[in-house]
Amino acid sequence: MQESQTKSMFVSRALEKILADKEVKRPQHSQLRRACQVALDEIKAELEKQRLGAAAPPKANFIEADKYFLPFELACQSKSPRVVSTSLDCLQKLIAYGHITGNAPDSGAPGKRLIDRIVETICNCFQGPQTDEGVQLQIIKALLTAVTSPHIEIHEGTILQTVRTCYNIYLASKNLINQTTAKATLTQMLNVIFTRMENQVLQEARELEKPMQSKPQSPVIQATAGSPKFSRLKQSQAQSKPTTPEKAELPNGDHAQSGLGKVSLENGEAPRERGSPVSGRAEPSRGTDSGAQEVVKDILEDVVTSAVKEAAEKHGLPEPDRALGALECQECAVPPGVDENSQTNGIADDRQSLSSADNLEPDVQGHQVAARFSHILQKDAFLVFRSLCKLSMKPLGEGPPDPKSHELRSKVVSLQLLLSVLQNAGPVFRSHEMFVTAIKQYLCVALSKNGVSSVPDVFELSLAIFLTLLSNFKMHLKMQIEVFFKEIFLNILETSTSSFEHRWMVIQTLTRICADAQCVVDIYVNYDCDLNAANIFERLVNDLSKIAQGRSGHELGMTPLQELSLRKKGLECLVSILKCMVEWSKDLYVNPNHQATLGQERLPDQEMGDGKGLDMARRCSVTSVESTVSSGTQTAIQDDPEQFEVIKQQKEIIEHGIELFNKKPKRGIQFLQEQGMLGAAVEDIAQFLHQEERLDSTQVGEFLGDSTRFNKEVMYAYVDQLDFCEKEFVSALRTFLEGFRLPGEAQKIDRLMEKFAARYIECNQGQTLFASADTAYVLAYSIIMLTTDLHSPQVKNKMTKEQYIKMNRGINDSKDLPEEYLSSIYDEIEGKKIAMKETKEHTIATKSTKQSVASEKQRRLLYNVEMEQMAKTAKALMEAVSHAKAPFTSATHLDHVRPMFKLVWTPLLAAYSIGLQNCDDTEVASLCLEGIRCAVRIACIFGMQLERDAYVQALARFSLLTASSSITEMKQKNIDTIKTLITVAHTDGNYLGNSWHEILKCISQLELAQLIGTGVKTRYLSGSGREREGSLKGHSLAGEEFMGLGLGNLVSGGVDKRQMASFQESVGETSSQSVVVAVDRIFTGSTRLDGNAIVDFVRWLCAVSMDELASPHHPRMFSLQKIVEISYYNMNRIRLQWSRIWHVIGDHFNKVGCNPNEDVAIFAVDSLRQLSMKFLEKGELANFRFQKDFLRPFEHIMKKNRSPTIRDMVIRCIAQMVSSQAANIRSGWKNIFAVFHQAASDHDGNIVELAFQTTGHIVSTIFQHHFPAAIDSFQDAVKCLSEFACNAAFPDTSMEAIRLIRFCGKYVSERPRVLQEYTSDDMNVAPGDRVWVRGWFPILFELSCIINRCKLDVRTRGLTVMFEIMKSYGHTFAKHWWQDLFRIVFRIFDNMKLPEQQSEKSEWMTTTCNHALYAICDVFTQFYEALHEVLLSDVFAQLQWCVKQDNEQLARSGTNCLENLVISNGEKFSPAVWDETCNCMLDIFKTTIPHVLLTWRPAGMEEEVSDRHLDVDLDRQSLSSIDRNASERGQSQLSNPTDDSWKGAPYAHQKLLASLLIKCVVQLELIQTIDNIVFYPATSKKEDAEHMVAAQQDTLDAEIHIETENQGMYKFMSSQHLFKLLDCLQESHSFSKAFNSNYEQRTVLWRAGFKGKSKPNLLKQETSSLACCLRILFRMYVDENRRDSWDEIQQRLLRVCSEALAYFITVNSESHREAWTSLLLLLLTKTLKISDEKFKAHASMYYPYLCEIMQFDLIPELRAVLRKFFLRIGLVYKIWIPEEPSQVPAALSSTW
């Protein structure tokens, strides 16, 4: 009731107002008056009925509406503005408040609804420019209400009409407010149309998700998204509870649930696709919604008010409702409004009319399009969008464009509206197949025309639209985007004639593109990594690089300011690209610092991050909507960086191959085949020529026309791959010649035409026109000729048609072709020549060949021509790809950045370098530095060393710190470069690697510059003589340390104050607190570098420090101080990292500590001391070696630096460490002892004394308390003491050192458990052996070293201590320890270690070896049980060695020791040991027999045959001169080696004599040794004396005879052992007998210089060997225990005695016979003592010899014994029988 009254009130008032108007009272308005009156009457009647309450249920609303609408329609058709305004106002209100819904069918037009008629009526009120301005405003309001009202629905043609009307009002209205309002209304309408479409899908999706049983929700009112008014509307509607009727009757008679939101479409059809309802929103309720009314009213008022305001402020489009990501930032928003007063010049674009009318046109293909939409709202949006696209394509008029012209304004506003639609596009629009297709087919083609417009506004809008497409639609527009870049943007940048304005706008656009990380990476992935696409990214960067470098600005007709602006923008783009790469790969970056990141400092990461986030969100939203909206969108291929990299490599190979082909085709083909990119078959090559468009068409033609067999085959295959089926001949020829340019040579053309003709006939075998292929061949040739004739400018007289027909007579198998046919060919060629393929590079001549443009006018003309060409190409390409689908990859992987950067780092570096070098503009410098920082970051992250080093070197170069030019040239940009370098070091330290070198070098030079700049004398060191502190003036400085800074001229003499002031000013900023702190932060921040980075950092810091210190006159220690600092900072790192750091720093300290400049070395050592103290404080766990590594530099310095000052300082440092940190030292003891080891051999008494004091303190005191910690270094301690002992200059120290070594033995003895429990990581020793390996072995080994190295007194002391230790602690030694020990002991006898000088060697053998030999035997005897099994053979071998030496004393000692050893231990010998012992003696005997005596002849001496008598005399003299006592003492029997007669003899003779002499001595000693071993303590001398006494007394009484049965080793030896000894004795005897008998040889020796008082002889050896032999045999002969051997003994005895007696008879010399006297006494005496039975055998053998002996003049004693012997023979053989026993001599009575 209330609603009806309200509506009636509206209508009544409006009708009354119309009637009251005086215009209506005119006659022509009678129908209007009548209609108004009828309507008023009806309303009154209706109200009366309602008042009486008798009213029936109201009729359907549309019947009433029909009645009420007629007067308004008539009013709108009137010519009176006031009447029309009133009518429009009422209609607007009725629609706004929902009183008119217009769903009723239009009675006047079948198939339409009333609302369509209402809207049409409103639209028709606009009659062009002359329409009243008030009416125009009312029309706008009414139409906006119609479109936005939630109560009515208008679609398709009607909605197009509303938009068209507003559009026309905007164009035609002269009122600025109306124009602006119309434009704002258009924007609002479009917003509503597209938002409704989006919301419908969302609503539909929500309803599908609802469970079937859920109760229906309140309908959703469609409204503009994001508008506060509409959000209020939604709230109010949500709060209200409208009543929903059960059913609503539709005009086609169907009934449907209003909740499902059915609406009727044009012609009553409601297409449904995919089962979705037609409408996603419910039919609005019939009830009046006061909230809705209020909102709609607000909207209308808002639109008008804001429009007026905007017009006044000359503002354009309202801000879009959604955030647009990185590409639509505020800075780059294109002002959509068109300045009415702006003047533009330029030639109109290519004119290609699409439609004659400047109106939007309804959809021609209505149903076909509709059938592909899921809802009518989508169709509405599509129609509006397509219309706007077509409007934007309309050409402008001829001549310069007029900003106020309808055409231009139409174009601009259409583009603005399109931009608005695209910027606010929702998921449906962005993904639905139809919209994507529309964008491809309409919008992109439109943009290809407008994108090269000479009108800046149009161009700018086109760029803005392209940006939006790139941001929101790139997934679908891969190929279109490529065309935009390739044909428009980059062409404009590359063309030298393009205007600054166009370049500026393009580069502004690129700035936005380059700021979107996703976009930048996507461009690279989708184009540069696509085999079929252009290298957009690479080309873009190269172009931007050229712009940034500011090349050829004068050629481009730009002012310097414009060029600079362009350069800045170019640089900004390049920097943005790198920022994007940094942003893209930021997850890989590890910032060593927490204070700041590169991103926060350098780039607007927030924007970039948000942009990327939005972009990702957009991609996600598109994906989510695609499943419900569209089935035709492109699915992205998988993002695999490795795959793309492979493709990129292939592409580069192909491009290189094409480049080669375009120079020399065969080379290109060969290269591609070698790389596997092209098959070997001719078909493959032919296909390649067809498909690859980048090939030079001329080269292709030349290649195909070549006469070689291979080329022919390719040409045949090429032609065979063409299909000419059912093609006209000329058309086929055109197709054929499209692929290449015909070569100039006739023969080549001939071959090509021949094959073409054959192929054409082959494809068209059914044709009857040509008799054979010959006809086709001739005709083809003639067509080529005709083309040349008709279209060549050189040909003046063109061929006529008749001439052409005549020329072709008789070519068809001697017949003619039809004249009509030839005529048509002529006409066709005349109209359009056969255009052969042009090479692409030549399409724009000025691009490749830079022309010098004479004037601005000429440049503009050229540019317009080029733009026209560009537009044609772009449009053609755009149309060609409008239906193509190419998969677009949305990049997600971080790894794309690496190949991207690798591709473009060089042009980037060129741009930044030239920018820094040539331009002093701070903004340019700032951009360049920012770019370099980003580039360094990327190169760092991806480990690209070459690239990283190049950029860091560029920074270093532009800091001027390493430049050779004068530093006074330093500018702000150089200061900023230094700051950038410092920042890079701070933020990218983890990745800098070798680039640290440049950075640290600059920091070093910076410090020098700061010091000089501030007038402070830099810390130079000039050795001991320091120069006076003060100014630099007059300072003579070496050139090299200033070479980098260019300070040579500044600091050398003669610098004036002005120059210095200038310099100080230029470097002043580098001394600012911020720079100083930043530099310091690099070093303090080194703690946050990772393990590898800190090593690189330290390594290069050390290298720079070495450079600083390299100056011989003025070394600097800045970096050295920093090394000390960072050592402090980083000491708390994990030990693994620290050890790697110290490996580098320690090595540096090694070098610095040995610096020839003492001040440097002192600083190094002192720094080392401080660091070491701090490090030692930390302590060390067992088995670690960090201290050892840390302290090693002390060791190195001590070893290499010979400066007493430094050496003394090192010792003092170490002593200080020992005194203060002894408790914390572990592995460091090794270094400490190593340092003292070096000091121990010094010649400086102070150094030795100080070192020894500390060493003594350690060994005697510290070891007491910290022995377990020092075990690992125990060996080093002993070695160190050994070195002190070996310093001959300080004997007292030596003796004390040996005492301390003895003291160390006490530690080992007292603490064996500590040694056993100690485990070391480098010693794989059994626990039982640790005491030996760690304790005893080092002590004994070092003592052996002392013995081997020192002088007599020290080595004797060492020897004594060594054997004392053995004797004292040997009981604790294991058997295998003794083996090691004796190896050490035997080193004393090692020939290699003996002194080389003969005298020293002799002394050594006589003293030390002698001493050692006896000591060995003592030890062996003491520990025989433990040693004999393992060491007896070694001892025997050593004794043998001694015996063989050329030292008489040592040889004697060897035999004596052997004797002592056997006598001392023989009782314990086993048979095996006796065996070994006897073998040893046998070996010694054999090796010491001087066989050379019998054969030797002096070199060059002739043999002299001597007179026999002379020999005899000499011999007699020789033998008589023997001093028996001397020979008994072991003196030479040959001659005296000290005799003067030796001096004349050569050294070799002397050596030989000495050797022979010693061998003889050894033989004699051995005989004595055997004698002593067998019979000790009885001696042969004693026995001989007894025999002599007995003979003298003429008795052999038993009383005088001494029993020796139980003495000596005889009883422990077997007969076999004794036989071995007997063999030795017999051999010795035989040799000496042979020598003594060889008078001639003895004479030779004597004459060769071996002459003394007599000739040499071996008489003593001869007699003593036989005597010993006889004693043993006779002892065995009477031994009952050896009865089983008596036979052998007897045989031996008989043989020996017989030979002896026989020899004696032959001796001529009386003295010789005298020497044998004792032998004969022994022989006869012993024989007399045997039993008669045995005596018989002997007597019978000896008898004849004894008889012979009788004739010699014998001594009485011998005669007495002989007498007894003969008597005994008489008795035994019973020759005589004594009458009584008293007659038998006493000596024989025992045998009697």
UniProtKB/Swiss-Prot annotation:
SMART domains: Sec7. InterPro entries: ARM-type_fold, DCB_dom, Mon2/Sec7/BIG1-like_HDS, Mon2/Sec7/BIG1-like_HUS, Sec7/BIG1-like_C, Sec7_C_sf, Sec7_dom, Sec7_dom_sf. GO terms for cellular component: asymmetric synapse; axonemal microtubule; centrosome; cytoplasmic vesicle; cytosol; dendritic spine; GABA-ergic synapse; glutamatergic synapse. Gene3D superfamilies: 1.10.220.20, Arf Nucleotide-binding Site Opener,domain 2 (1.10.1000.11). CDD domains: Sec7. Signal peptide: none annotated. The modification N-acetylmethionine is found at M1. Residues 661-792 form the SEC7 domain. This is Brefeldin A-inhibited guanine nucleotide-exchange protein 2. It is found in: Cytoplasm; Membrane; Golgi apparatus; Cytoplasm, Perinuclear region. Residues 214-225, 233-243 have a biased composition (Polar residues). Inhibited by brefeldin A. The modification Phosphoserine is found at residues 214, 218, 227, 355-356, 621, 624, 707, 1518, 1520-1521, 1532, 1535, 1541, 1789. Disulfide bonds: none annotated. PANTHER family: BREFELDIN A-INHIBITED GUANINE NUCLEOTIDE-EXCHANGE PROTEIN 2, GUANYL-NUCLEOTIDE EXCHANGE FACTOR. Residues 515-535 are annotated as: HUS.
